[in-house]
């Protein structure tokens, strides 16, 4: 091979090597990695203190809305009648000293309110009566005995509340008893149990005393009161009341009839002696007591129970 041919052969392979693709060296990447390591090393390390500041920052960004309990007025507005009644009862039990204040600021109980409560308690008696059993049997009475006792105790409380000197308007006790005896009292079951018959007989006896006394006081209080009784036809009302209650209040009817006859015929009744009813209700608060402690089965009643039945 000549010298010229050798040079051409070398140039051929040299040109071929120039077009060969070779892998890049990792010198630059290594240099970049080293620089990154140096940069990370120069940075401060992550400390727990920074995390605490971050948590504190997040906490400060939360809305500052705190919960609170309902006010007393809102609670009272929300409660139903039974819940409110239990609340006041518990309050008086825990703090008896608030009872006088409660009585002082409480609204006056009306006749309609009292009759509504008594009718509700009567409905409880009737709704709890056993089925397919004689309504007058002792078993029926025992089933509703707590409701019966509650009814008579409530009746006693309302009646005494409407009597003088608590109530100065004599028409209030008259209207209360007349409406009660016409609408509520006749609907009571006629139990044969001795305890119930005692309660019932005691009620009839004391209501006769109350009505007779209050009626005479009312008619003698003002001259035009007898005209009011005539115009409102009280005589018919008392006659119906007596008929609805097995004629147990016929004496009150006769008393009113006598007063009206005396007013309409003063000459015919001038020779009849007047009855003095002053002080007839003295001690009635002790006698008109339907508490379960005064039950004939407890032996705490005045006199012989069977004398009043």
From Swiss-Prot:
It comes from the Eukaryota. Keywords: Cytoplasm, Nucleus, Protein transport, Transport. Belongs to the cut8/STS1 family. PANTHER family: FI02826P. Residues 21-31 have a biased composition (Basic residues). The lineage of its organism: Eukaryota, Fungi, Dikarya, Ascomycota, Saccharomycotina. The gene is STS1. Binds the proteasome. Residues 20-45 are annotated as: Disordered. One of its GO terms (biological process) is protein transport. One of its GO terms (molecular function) is proteasome binding. One of its GO terms (cellular component) is nuclear membrane. It is found in: Cytoplasm; Nucleus. Residues 32-43 have a biased composition (Basic and acidic residues). It comes from Ogataea parapolymorpha (strain ATCC 26012 / BCRC 20466 / JCM 22074 / NRRL Y-7560 / DL-1). Involved in ubiquitin-mediated protein degradation. Regulatory factor in the ubiquitin/proteasome pathway that controls the turnover of proteasome substrates. Targets proteasomes to the nucleus and facilitates the degradation of nuclear proteins. InterPro entries: Cut8/Sts1_fam (IPR013868), Cut8/Sts1_sf (IPR038422). This is Tethering factor for nuclear proteasome STS1.
């Amino acid at each position: 091979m000549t010298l010229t041919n050798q040079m051409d052969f070398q140039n051929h392979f040299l040109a071929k090597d120039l077009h060969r693709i070779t892998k890049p060296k990792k010198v630059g990447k290594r240099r970049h990695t080293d620089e990154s390591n140096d940069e990370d090393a120069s940075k401060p390390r992550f400390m727990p203190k920074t995390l605490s500041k971050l948590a504190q920052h997040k906490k400060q960004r939360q809305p500052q809305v705190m919960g609170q309990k309902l006010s007393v007025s809102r609670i009272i507005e929300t409660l139903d009648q039974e819940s409110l009644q239990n609340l006041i009862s518990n309050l008086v039990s825990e703090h008896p000293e608030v009872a006088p204040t409660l009585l002082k600021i409480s609204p006056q109980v009306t006749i309609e309110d009292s009759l509504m409560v008594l009718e509700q308690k009567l409905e409880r008696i009737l709704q709890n009566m056993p089925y397919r059993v004689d309504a007058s049997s002792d078993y029926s009475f025992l089933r509703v005995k707590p409701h019966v006792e509650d009814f008579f105790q409530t009746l006693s409380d309302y009646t005494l509340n409407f009597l003088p000197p608590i109530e100065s308007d004599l028409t209030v006790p008259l209207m209360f008893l007349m409406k009660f005896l016409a609408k509520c009292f006749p609907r009571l079951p006629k139990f044969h149990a001795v305890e119930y018959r005692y309660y019932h007989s005691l009620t009839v006896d004391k209501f006769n005393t109350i009505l007779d006394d209050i009626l005479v006081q009312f008619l003698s209080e003002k001259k035009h009161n007898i005209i009011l009784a005539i115009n409102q036809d009280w005589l018919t009302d008392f006659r119906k009341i007596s008929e609805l209650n097995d004629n147990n209040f016929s004496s009150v009817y006769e008393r009113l009839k006598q007063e009206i006859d005396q007013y309409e015929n003063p000459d015919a009744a001038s020779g009849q002696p007047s009855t003095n009813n002053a002080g007839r209700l003295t001690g009635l608060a002790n006698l008109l007591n339907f508490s379960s402690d005064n039950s004939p089965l407890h032996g705490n009643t005045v006199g012989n129970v069977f004398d009043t039945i």
